[in-house]
Structures are given as C-alpha cells and as structure tokens.
Amino acid sequence: MKMTRLYPLALGGLLLPAIANAQTSQQDESTLEVTASKQSSRSASANNVSSTVVSAPELSDAGVTASDKLPRVLPGLNIENSGNMLFSTISLRGVSSAQDFYNPAVTLYVDGVPQLSTNTIQALTDVQSVELLRGPQGTLYGKSAQGGIINIVTQQPDSTPRGYIEGGVSSRDSYRSKFNLSGPIQDGLLYGSVTLLRQVDDGDMINPATGSDDLGGTRASIGNVKLRLAPDDQPWEMGFAASRECTRATQDAYVGWNDIKGRKLSLSDGSPDPYMRRCTDSQTLSGKYTTDDWVFNLISAWQQQHYSRTFPSGSLIVNMPQRWNQDVQELRAATLGDARTVDMVFGLYRQNTREKLNSAYDMPTMPYLSSTGYTTAETLAAYSDLTWHLTDRFDIGGGVRFSHDKSSTQYHGSMLGNPFGDQGKSNDDQVLGQLSAGYMLTDDWRVYTRIAQGYKPSGYNIVPTAGLDAKPFVAEKSINYELGTRYETADVTLQAATFYTHTKDMQLYSGPVGMQTLSNAGKADATGVELEAKWRFAPGWSWDINGNVIRSEFTNDSELYHGNRVPFVPRYGAGSSVNGVIDTRYGALMPRLAVNLVGPHYFDGDNQLRQGTYATLDSSLGWQATERINISVHVDNLFDRRYRTYGYMNGSSAVAQVNMGRTVGINTRIDFF
C-alpha cells in the first residue's frame, strides 16, 4: 500500500478550519444558496477558479444537443471519440485522456451523479444549465476529476407547469423529436416530469462491400421520468429519477489518412458494416434536509450498461460485447449563512464499478483470439472544502481529500488454440489537497491564485491481452498551479488565467488498436494561458470571444515518449460568436454567427499522426413566431471544412475518422404553457 502526501496542501486544508473558527466574528446569519455544483456563490471554490456557466437558451442557440458538442460553448474544452461514442477523448488545459479510453481526464456529472466513462458522450435532455470547472476538483466532488468537471443540471419539476414538443430535420436524413411535460402532481407536495427524445444523426460513409451509404452516425432513443416530493413549509425534500437510453451507431468507420474528403471506407474486401448498440439504465434517489446552519444532501445512484460492438479490423472481424454496473453513494454537508466568516463543505463518497468483457477476433477461416475478462474498481473517499472570509474583499480557501482505491481483474482466453489467463488485486491510498486565495480589487474585479492536486486511480487493463501478466498500472497524479482574474459588470464579463500542470505516471495506451494495453508512460508538463470575454454592446446583442495557448509535452525522463507532445491537446484554440435579437412586427428574429479555431495536435504518443489547424463557421437564425412557437434554421460548418477527429496506424498505413462536414437543418418548438 502506497500513501502519497503533499504536506503543505493536505495540512493546510486540515488546519484552516481550526484557524478560521478561532477568529469567527459574531455576524447575522441568513440563507446561502448551495448550487447544484456543490458550491455557495461566496465560496473560494466558486470564485478562486476558472469556470464557465451556460444556460439552456445559450445551448439551444449554439445547437448543442449532445455532450460532444459542448466545446462550442465551453472554451478550452475538446471532446471527440476514439473509434465510437463509447470511448471519448477529452482534453482541458493540457490534461488529456491520452488514449485512456475508460478514464476521461474530465468527469461528466449529471444532476450530481458521475457518469460511466462509456456514457460520457450522450444526448442532452431537458438541460437547465451546464457548468465547466477547470483544474482538479477532488476536494469538492466525490469522484476526483484530474482535469476538471462538466456539471450538467437538468430542469427539476416544481409548481410551475412546463411542457413542449420539438421537431427538426437536417442533412443526411437526420431528424430529432422531443416531448417534455413537467409540473405539480399535487401542488405543495408532489411534482413530476417526463421527457422522451428520439435523435438520429446519420452519416454518409460508404462500405463498398455491402453498399451501405449512411455509415458513421448514431440513432438514439431516450426516456426520463422524475418525481420530487417537497412538502410546503418542510425542511426536507426527496427525489427519484429513472432513465433509459439506447443508441445504435455505425461509427467505427475509417478512411485512408490522406483521403479525408472521401466517403469510401478503408476496409478489406468483403468486410461487414461496423455496428454498435449501447443501452444504459440509470436510477437516482436523492434527499435534502435544511437546518438553520447547514444543508445536508444525500445521493444514491445506479447505472447499468450493456453494449454489443462488431467492427472489421484489417482481415479480422471483432466482436466485443461488454457489461457495466456502477453504483455511487455520496453524503454532503454544507454551511448556510450569507454573513458567515467561514463556509464549509464536508463529504463522504463511495463508488463501485464492475465490468465484464467478452471479445472474439475471427479470421475468415478460423478463430484467432477469444477472451473473457472481469474487472472491478472501488473508491472510498472523504473530502472537505472551506472558505475563510478574512475581510469583505479577501478570502482564502483550502481543502483535503482522502481516498482508498481497490481494483481487481480476472481473465482467461485462447489465441490460436493456446490458452492464457491471469488474475490480480491491488489497492492504493491517496491524500490530495488544494489551497487558494482571492482578493477583490474593486467591486467588479477579482484576482486569485490556486494550487490543487488531482489523480486517476490505479487499476488494470479492461481488455485482456495474451501473453501479458495481470500487472496493475499505478495512479496518475498531477498538481496544478494557477493565477487568474475575473472582471464582471452589467455589460462586460472577462476572465483570464495562466496555469502550469505537472503530471507523473501518465496512463497511456500503446500497441495495435484492439489489443492495446494501458501502462504508465512517464511525466508531462502543461503550461498555458486562457482568456474569455463577453460584451453586451447593445440591448439584446452580445459578442463572445475566447482563446488559449497550451504547451503540453512529455518530459525528457519519460520512458516511451520523451520530448513529444501529449496526444489530443491542440497547441492553441480560439472562438468568437455574435448573438442578437431583432424585434419585428412579425416576431423577434435571433441571429447567431460563430467561428471556432482548433490548433494542430497529435493522435498518438509517437507524434506520427498529426491533424493541422482548422476553423469552422456556424450560423443560425431563430424566429419567435408567437409567444409559444419558435422556428430556427442553422448551418453548421458553413464552408464544409473536413478534418480528422481520430486516427491510428493500421499495419504500415494510417487510417482516420473524419467529421461529417456541412449540416443544414430546421427546428420547431411549441410550448404548451
């Protein structure tokens, strides 16, 4: 068992409450809102950090209908998939998934519940807001997020009746239909909602062997129900939510590396179409109890996922059905009171994940490789995060997290008739901390500094590999240093930060695709600057602009990739959009024009597969025809810019996945109330 300590951070987080409580002044107490992001608006963790919050109308205006489209509205975030939607590649501030398909660098939360890694890319249903927190968040969130947190908050049912239907069509015979109804079942006591969604995003890739010409897309069906028991004049409430999502996809579709404008897949003669079906069931029980000084929240959540996946790989046909089960429990307590000198959050967290994989690699005339594997992972954690308001302008924050991680694996199989197998268990302990300080230079201008640690747990490879023992990889750990500022008035919002992140024991996949193994690849350093601003230059009009420059490299003492760039991290990025409202006698018109620039980046640790700089231009025009009817048209990627989203070496040649190109669509929404 190995204990990792960084005493200045951990001890600072432990000692700060005692120091602060010793000097707590006698002040009037009043209610302090604890948001879905687990922070009060006055806490250091809410203010001494780089963050972006996007509302539901902003998501709709930008055409964000799934989590992999969030980079359109969350500056600095990059999301693609490596092969298909099961395996997301995420980077933020130079911290990258780096081909670690089963453990993204940024954790996705939905209503306080961390999602399965294979469910990170999902359609969005009835979203109220999305928040991005940059940098490690392990002393505030139960699941230690190394690079940051994406926190999706959905609309909760209350006494206000809501309901609408949506429908739309777009390029490549794609369409979207949605129904939502929410409101009181018994006003003052019980509330409920239901959401149904059908979302089809077909592709246009061609398999010459089968004649299929719509490959590369997804078709999702989703249902969600919520109940909220919240008696009037009572300090408690309870909630229940259940959802089911089934998605069919044909995304394991590749073209030749230099054929990014082509539509014919790079396949062996006679290869079948790629196919994947993913079904995910989720259930959540939640409770909240409020006293004069504290608010207590309890969440217990379960997710069950199974998927089947078949795709051609060279001369082999691969079948990889997999089952996942995850349950999460979290208890959190937070202080209340606007005038408190000390604000605190304490939490206990448990996560248990179980996985079973069956895989078969078949040659045209005989089986080549088959295996069955079982893996488990469990995390037990306790965390605290607090703020000491030294004056009305100066505060310091600190936090500490203790984690105990356990994992196990057991697998067996045969390769060309030769059996193999092994099993193993491992456990590890981590102590993480964070410290921050912030000062209000004026009523509108704040400067801050922050130091925080993050990690990805130790564990075992999910996919068994013949000839290799069950050897665990160790935890990947990082420390982030940040200096930032935020300025906000009624007309202008500006935030900027410079940061440095050092990561050691990086977890990186290597080897042939389909048979890759995860191991520790050494150390990496990421440095960068980021800026985002919004100017509301006229009533109903705003201009957004953002940019970042990042240098993320493996250090010279990294065993495999010394001096190379970390995969999936663009060297720079930028974006700008103009949004407006034009009042006419026939209803308001809402134009939007947005451009996004993504810098060069690599898809592999060897830095052999490089995607160059590209830019896309999106436009939309909404029309509020009546109080309850909205019609919008949009053109995404107006100039049909084609670029690679993922690539790998297939033998001696490289293949790539490419984006879908220009998409034109029209959507209509009708509100019931």
UniProtKB/Swiss-Prot annotation:
GO CC annotation: cell outer membrane
Sequence motif TonB C-terminal box, residues: 657-673
Listed Gene3D superfamilies: TonB-dependent receptor, beta-barrel domain
Motif TonB box per UniProt: ranges: 30-37
Pfam family, one: Plug
Family from the record: Belongs to the TonB-dependent receptor family.
Keywords, ordered alphabetically: Cell outer membrane, Ion transport, Iron, Iron transport, Membrane, Receptor, Signal, TonB box, Transmembrane, Transmembrane beta strand, Transport
UniProt cross-references to InterPro entries, sorted A to Z: Plug_dom, TonB-dep_rcpt-like, TonB-dep_rcpt_b-brl, TonB_rcpt_b-brl_sf, TonB_sidphr_rcpt
Protein name, entry field: Pesticin receptor
Role according to the record: Receptor for the bacteriocin pesticin and for the siderophore yersiniabactin.
Any GO molecular function: signaling receptor activity
Keyword S-adenosyl-L-methionine: no
Residue span, TBDR beta-barrel domain: 160-672
CDD domains per record: ligand_gated_channel (cd01347)
Membrane topology: Multi-pass membrane protein
Annotated compartments: Cell outer membrane
Signal peptide (from-to): 1-22
